Amino acid sequence: MAKTLYEKVFDAHVVYEGKNELPILYIDRHLIHEVTSPQAFSGLKMAKRRMARADLTLATIDHDVSTKSVDLNACSDMAKEQITTLMQNTKEFGVRLLGLGDKNQGIVHIVSPELGFTLPGVTLVCGDSHTATHGAFGALAFGIGTSEVEHVMATQTLKQAKLKTMKIECKGQFQKGVYAKDLILYLIAQYGTAKGTGYAIEFCGELIRNLSMEARMTLCNMAIEFGAKVGMIAPDEITFEYIKGKEFAPKGEEFQKYCEYWKSLRSDEGAKYDESITLDVSKIKPQISYGTNPSQVIGIDEKIPKISDFKNQSEQKSLLDALSYVNLEQDQVIEGVKIDIVFIGSCTNGRLEDLKIAADILKGRKIHKNVKALIVPGSMQVRKEAENLGLDKIFIEAGCEWRYAGCSMCLGMNDDKANSGQRVASTSNRNFVGRQGKGSITHLMSPASAAACAIEGVICDNRKYLGV
């Protein structure tokens, strides 16, 4: 029977399936961080259990950490407590921790691929909603709750219902100034934040095959904003080249054997999906969010919708509520809206390729005098590689702040926050009410668009800086 990529990986990991019971999956990789792990470790201690496979668990510090310094004392009191607790727990249970000062510390969904801990065909979980990022490698990766974190720690297994499958085929090529971030924002804008609910989605097609691993991770990262639990891309030579030589990757002849197996991790010809979507990506323009959920997105040359554009009363109310919060109007042109802060980073767009894209636009230019711009590499490895290329100098000379690795302004859990009423051009993944600080206003966009906004101090078209 022909199978999809998702079905192949899922079926290969079922260790038990009783009558009228959910299948039990073996979990190959478990990522943990300081926010969703303390209760799980406490549960293990109370039950006097050890971890089933501490060697298949990797911990990092990312959500709470200060990006101004690698000194623990630079963090808030709550952050210090959570970080110290993780340090103690990982030491007690024998889990490798990428702690403050570690050359590999950074955002969980960036450091795992960097180290080759994420591999094609594995099952991977983390107490974080953006775990779908790792599906870019052909891994079956999804976020779990804290009680499930404890269960995986104790048993290295998890009960999981089998999801429906959706194919998203991307045809054509991007216009100049359009990136993977624009594609995923466009997809969510067209179909809504619930379209993927109950599905494992697979991105495929001509465009996907030509994307870098960084761009593929951006796509899969925001599968959750599309409503999907899982986003996957079949591994190929680009994947294998990215993995080769990394710390946890197979070595030598073993690597070649794995590559032969990984080549089988693609949907069979004739495999049936429960739903399919085909996109012509050549029509997509730089995308900007205008509201308070990731489906409220328009092209840079478009106007904010009018209430009459929606027939559904709940959508009409959502529009009015969003515009009231973000202080914008129906039928308003999005280009030219004043920006206070620019944030380039996060598990969506904090990789070296993202920083290169931003640096290409900022090189030789200055940011607007009324703009504060934070450039936050997703890991210390990204930071080092960027500095080796001189990107830090480009950012600093432009007037940006060059920070250490962490989740930073993606969420209001650390010191990097916007004040009430401040408008942020952000490369993160969510624009919810207060997401970047109480009363803050978020506009999601690509690193190129964010860099252009930093220069002009308003939402603008990045293509003018690319000779388009």
Curated annotation (Swiss-Prot):
GO terms for molecular function: 3-isopropylmalate dehydratase activity; 4 iron, 4 sulfur cluster binding; metal ion binding. [4Fe-4S] cluster binds at C347, C407, C410. One of its GO terms (biological process) is L-leucine biosynthetic process. Binds 1 [4Fe-4S] cluster per subunit. NCBIfam families: leuC, PRK05478.1, PRK12466.1. HAMAP family: LeuC_type1. This is 3-isopropylmalate dehydratase large subunit.
